[in-house]
Amino acid sequence: MTKLIFMGTPDFSATVLKGLLTDDRYEILAVVTQPDRAVGRKKVIQETPVKQAAKEAGLSIYQPEKLSGSPEMEDLMKLGADGIVTAAFGQFLPSKLLDSMDFAVNVHASLLPRHRGGAPIHYALIQGDEEAGVTIMEMVKEMDAGDMISRRSIPITDEDNVGTLFEKLALVGRDLLLDTLPAYIAGDIKPEPQDTSQVTFSPNIKSEEEKLNWNKTNRQLFNQIRGMNPWPVAHTFLKGDRFKIYEALPVEGQGNPGEILSIGKKELIVATAEGALSLKQVQPAGKPKMDIASFLNGVGRTLTVGERFGD
């Protein structure tokens, strides 16, 4: 039986962990995840999905603020683990820890070498990629730069957003890891170096990147909106107030970028640099998320054709 330390944080990681727990070829000696955080307006302390899954399985849990140089790292090195599996952990692993293991692999939610970094699923959508996927790779000190052990792709559809793609790729990552680990541990797979000429980076989304620029095409804005749904959520401004857009569809239309072209009972069409967007799910300032019909029947009922979204 191979003894593992698992490291991860979000739902994606929890799905991978649960997959490992179903396979009796592996024993999880410990789980490492990010500390509990205060979330939302009420600052409610929330455990990570990986911590919740580990508690349900009765596993030992470590939550260092920073793994490098921590007492937790020293404890982990004394457990006698054969290897480490990480999936969206959110911290760099110290070389000292990596060197103490027979192997260390990462489940990364992109088709490397494209989309190294912390937001690969977001950027696959924002940049209009036709496919997404998961890469199992060896861990090295440089971020997401290790040799690739295996890859698996899935198509991106127009119905996908960050939420749906996260769910799909979590299952892909779980299955690919279970399919890959036995042969890799046995030495039957020769990892492949990444082509450095094809590397792109997908760092965590910055707040300024959430703002919509109506001087882009309808397709570009469609990809930005779904590439931030359900988090961190794209926004614009309406009458000086922040206005979040969760869902929109590219449609035909022509006008000044940001201009309202038409208003119906269940339709709000806004011009872009090329074509237009039909807004479907929005959140006005100080209000909950709502469909466009509810918005137009409520706080949006005073809108008129010709008004503008934007600064």
Curated annotation (Swiss-Prot):
Q: Which InterPro entries match?
A: Fmt, Formyl_trans_C, Formyl_trans_C_sf, Formyl_transf_N, Formyl_transf_N_sf, Formyl_transferase-like_C_sf, GART_AS, Met-tRNA-FMT_C
Provide the alphabetized UniProt keywords: Protein biosynthesis, Transferase
What reaction does this enzyme carry out catalytically?
A: L-methionyl-tRNA(fMet) + (6R)-10-formyltetrahydrofolate = N-formyl-L-methionyl-tRNA(fMet) + (6S)-5,6,7,8-tetrahydrofolate + H(+)
Q: Name one GO cellular component term.
A: cytosol
Task: Return the Pfam families for the record.
Answer: Formyl_trans_C (PF02911), Formyl_trans_N (PF00551)
Give a yes or no for keyword Transferase in this entry.
yes
Example GO molecular function term?
A: methionyl-tRNA formyltransferase activity
Q: What is its EC number?
A: 2.1.2.9
Biological process, per Gene Ontology: conversion of methionyl-tRNA to N-formyl-methionyl-tRNA
Organism's domain of life? Answer: Bacteria
Binding positions ((6S)-5,6,7,8-tetrahydrofolate) = 110-113
Name the family.
Belongs to the Fmt family.
The task this protein performs is described as: Attaches a formyl group to the free amino group of methionyl-tRNA(fMet). The formyl group appears to play a dual role in the initiator identity of N-formylmethionyl-tRNA by promoting its recognition by IF2 and preventing the misappropriation of this tRNA by the elongation apparatus.
Q: What is this protein called?
A: Methionyl-tRNA formyltransferase
Which organism does this record belong to? Streptococcus pneumoniae (strain ATCC BAA-255 / R6)
